[in-house]
Amino acid sequence: MLEIAVTVTARIPFQSNQIDCWRSFQSRSNAASSLRNLRSSSLATWLVAVACLGAPLGAYCQTADHSPTNPPTQNANPALSAAAVRPSAAAQQVPRLTTTVEVHGEAKDDYLPDAVAVGTLNGSTLKETPLSATVITRDLLNDQVSRLLSDVVKNDASVDDDYVPVGYYGWYEIRGFAIDMATGLEINGMTIAGEQDVPLENKERVEILKGIAGLESGVANAGGLINYVTKRPAAIKAIDLATDHRGSTYGAADVGWLLGSRKQVGARFNLGGERIASYMNDTNGWRALGAGAADWKLSPMAILKGDFEYQHKVERDGSGYQLLGGATVPDINQIYPSTMLGDQPWGPPDTYNTFNTSMRLDYTLPHNWAIFGAASYSHSLIEDNVIYAYGTPFDANGNVSCPNAPDAPAYFFCPDGSYGIYDYRDPGELRKDEVAEAILTGHVKTGPVIHDVAAGGEVFLRSVQQPGFYTMDNPYSSDGIVQDGAVYAYVGSENIYQPTAPVAIESPLQSAGPRRLWEDSHQAAAILQDRIHLPGRIQLIGGGRYDALRDHNYSGWATSPCTASPVPGPVGDPCPTTYPAPNQPNYSVVTPPNNTDQDVWLPFYAATYAPVSSVTLYGNYSELLSLGPQAAWWVDNANQFLAPYHTRQAEIGAKYEPSQRILLTTAFFRTRAPFFYPESDGAGGFEFVSQGRETHDGIEANVQGKAANWLRLTASAAAINATSDETGTPAFDGKQVINVPHLHTTVFADLTVPHVQGLHLMPGWSYSGRKEATRDDTVSVPSVNIFNLGARYTPGGEEGRVTFRIYANNIADKKYWSDTGTNTGDSFLWLGAPTTVRLSAHYTF
């Protein structure tokens, strides 16, 4: 089956300063006939228009009005990061600065942003930064009719799905390491609660930043992070309409204004709604969103920016498959992506209410100094409900009930395809991320050496609240209805090779316990960096982040405040030393919170060399601190979090930009982290441990931009050898890590059709190598090729106001396994999406 996506894109209206620039150019043409001749030249007109859309134009536009986003006394793009860049030729301009990697740039018609990494002190291009990054522009998002992050990350071969259910927010991995949902997603460089589907309607681009150092991200997982950049105010009025072959409907509006005598105030609003018709049975839903952005140039030296977005989403989500008996991949020819495992008519949908907001003030100081301050708040409230397909069925006595396999592991499906069905309800999951930061930057020259220095601080607060125990004295209610956390009730069994059958919900109907504090995390960081510019196009960067981490995880205590088995570690209040309930004498020892109180220095060192203007060679070394993972429920140290761990990475790379239209990059990296797995005790039990290491050695190559006048291209390839060693289990040593293919490639092209004005064809292809499903590499899913095809048509040519798009994913309707990742210690298999065809139309007034 096919789904079609069509998007329409119109000419972007000029802002006032751009109109003034154009008029200035016109007024400087001495003869009207000369101007008419110039206008007849499409190339010359295009060059002038592009110039007027960009930064101040020197001879033509230095006196023109500036938009509130780009005051004339500061650079168009901010700065602070370990990613150092060449200094400004004229050292008078004082850059702004941020402590997280973010890429800023203006959209062009070549899929190549004029971008900088935040942390670079002067608004430099991607070519000049000592790190690897991919930027998905607004044009590319439109051409692929993207709605979710899963639509976006397919453009970078270094990114893979890790655990991406239909109807639920997804987990992803970069360079083979899973993103930490607490710290791995950002909006405008500010960390957000990652447990959400971030709307794309108000985003100008999405940045995938790889190999991030602790300087930018503080305490996070290795691999990288994903940053969303919001649209800024502009004079625009546009609408989008879309559908697909399954009956989804979509509408959105994008309106903005520039106000004031010099356009010093701007506002922009995005509104949207969607009725979601999913390819998986009974997982349909809907969503509504509203977003706004405002810029205010308070003075020639100061600008204030603000953003907010809110999304309400309701949708049922489905479960993934598991290995049969822990040793066999299900027969893909007998199962279908449309099947919702364990589907029951009484299953409620998930409900999401997410809110993200931020504010930033930039101020230019005298004598080549600048300062900025920013604050953000992110809120994700989820009613998490799913008919959960997991593990084996059980008999009335609680024993594994697999036909002809009584000893099958309970945490995998039965060898014959039977599985257990659970009523899982976890209402009121509340996650909040709060960030505040301030950075001072300056420019110092000592003889032939130039220093771009930055210093500042950041505070990060995160809290997680979920259902917990009924009372301190009674984890459950006396009638057994109120649980000590989420509802997780076994209700029956099904078989993956048979149609689903109705089963009754548990009786009496259970309810989740009251909301309790599960996690309270604080980070206070001091940031310092010096970027040294030496003669001969050489730069040296040294810096780091001193991070004071105070992370207190109460998840074990919140669901069972006291247990019969002591757990090593500090005993934390509010649970008393001795359980006070006389009617439960077996509960006498505290389950302590998992406390992490650690101060750490996270360095970043880099060097760049530009032998010629079109080439940049770089190398970097960085360290990162990550919080330990959580053990699965079925190991001896069930649900416990392991200690924090360090990750170290070294990277060298080269970037080549033969023109301003295309960028070619390659990078070689080595990342080393501890290896975590459930270790057998030899007596049928397991303990989740950190033993040995996993080393990810990889090569990345990317091409992004306009390869020819008729061809725009986004292509990526990643070859990663991710192996585990010294694990204590010989069968795991020297083996490829689960869910990391040796080779992954992706290509998307935009081909201009000759002789048909405004028509483009957009073919795409991706290849993913074999993925291992077990740690000893004895079970894997095969490699797969996926082909996509789309078209874009703008009646009247590229300057038309309306654009139609059609885009089809997986046009061959290939049935395949998309990932073999893990979630809280358990392994899952997910089927890839079938053919999906979307149609969209965009109109600009």
Where are these regions (language model features)?
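Acidic, small-polar-rich N-terminal luminal/periplasmic segments of exported/outer-membrane proteins
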Residues: 97-236, 652
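Outer-membrane beta-barrel translocator/receptor signature
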Residues: 202-204, 215-292, 298-302, 355, ...
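Acidic/polar loop-and-plug regions of large Gram-negative outer-membrane beta-barrel proteins
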Residues: 274-278, 291-297, 301-364, 368, ...
